[in-house]
């Protein structure tokens, strides 16, 4: 005996029919857009969005590196840092960043993300300037903690912003554009410190001037970001009405969503249960565990007999190598689709080699080999770029401690090198498991689509040669788990 459907079932069916109708309408509208029109739109997006994001990331990395430069220009002596003090100063930045992640994730889903990010940029610029006013370990440690807290939201927010404006195939190049500023910042930041270090008759210590200058520039960049960065495709001041519509439809057809100022607790629960989310966590953890070399590289080089000025100059090639590897991570998958995971595994070998060289090379007679090892060991930004692109493309929906690097181990920092080597090996394993998991999930969804279990194609809904991939309404806020027509990018 057939049971009568209840109100909830009828409501769900009506919502499904309405969603299908909206998807079909959006696809018909999008098919009327020529490739030339879409390319012109993307160029327009790039001209406005990429410079804003690139400048912010440049200053974020400069602010992170400033402690590295200051360490060889008298900071440790002036503030009377001893023992593990400097290691704790480095660590507290990451403690602050860790403490900020959950409140930042909540606020990003409740507030307009671009305004939220702009305000945090201004705040962290102000905190960076306070580093120039520190008088001892305690004030420096507190400032570093709050600097990490203020900066914690930027990289996750930039991943979301990228996915809110660009189609999945466009993510690697755009992520590489702003992440590659880390290499540029490494070069220009060292030259800036070299110039400040050579200045005569300064009324304050030179390392204090570095913090004041970089912090002031960061705060100014935050003001520009607040004013110039639009919230989403529907509010882009630099696009006309037609272009805003096309920009929104692109996301719908590509199974994306735009910024929604609301927190979805169900998506949070889903994320905590999804194995791939924990793989992203492992990627971030492994990369983060290796980043102290970025803060200690100047001390490593300086500890092997180089002057502060020589230390700034011999570190420049490290920025260039970082820049090149970031673009390798972006361009190889572009020309050879489906190779992003394998490219990332290969790029892990660069810092793995550097960490191994730093650990194993003799101290005498191999000075340049040790310098080169710091260049290679610090090339973690390419893995950050690649992992960030994976998250931007494959996650839908809206919603440490460094005591291994201790003074007693200087200048080689043996425990830190061993930790880095272990982290890179763990990251390679994580990438391999992740690649296997998404290939398996895609194959499962293809099989279910072939059986008619999930609708995957439209265009008469008959799956013929003229059928095209169905889009999802841009306001649907379906996650990658809920949207069974979604396919993960390998």
Positions of the model-derived regions?
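Intracellular terminal tails of multi-pass secondary transporters
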Residues: 1-59, 68, 83, 226-261, ...
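Helix-breaking motifs and short loop linkers at transmembrane-helix boundaries and internal kinks
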Residues: 63, 79-80, 103, 111-112, ...
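Extracytoplasmic gate region of multi-pass secondary transporters
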Residues: 68, 266-330, 388
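Conserved MFS/SLC helix-loop-helix module at the cytosolic interface between two early adjacent transmembrane helices
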Residues: 98-138
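Helix-to-loop junctions at the C-terminal end of transmembrane segments
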Residues: 99-112, 325-339
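Structural signature of the two symmetry-related core transmembrane helices
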Residues: 115-129, 342-357
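Glycine-rich segments within core transmembrane alpha-helices of 12-TM secondary carriers
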Residues: 172-204, 212, 217-218, 402-404
